[in-house]
């Protein structure tokens, strides 16, 4: 169970980080 939770947290973090990067760069390119 703990292993699955670790993987879930890692995937969630990557998705959130990717979304943050996408938003950051899209705002940057709007200029």
From Swiss-Prot:
Keyword line: Cell inner membrane, Cell membrane, Membrane, Stress response, Transmembrane, Transmembrane helix
One Pfam short name: MgtS-like
Topology Periplasmic: residue spans = 1-4
Main location, first listed in the record? membrane
GO process terms (BP): cellular response to magnesium starvation; magnesium ion homeostasis
What are the coiled-coil residue ranges?
A: none
Q: What is the effect of changing residue 19 to A?
A: No change in activity
Q: Which residues lie on this side of the membrane: Cytoplasmic?
A: 26-31
Q: Which domain of life is it from?
A: Bacteria
* Quaternary state and interactors: Interacts with MgtA.
> What is the name listed in the Swiss-Prot or TrEMBL entry for this protein?
Small protein MgtS
Organism of origin is Escherichia coli (strain K12)
């Amino acid at each position: 169970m703990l292993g699955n939770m670790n993987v879930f947290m890692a995937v969630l973090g990557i998705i959130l980080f990717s979304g943050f990067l996408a938003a950051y760069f899209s705002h940057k390119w709007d200029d």
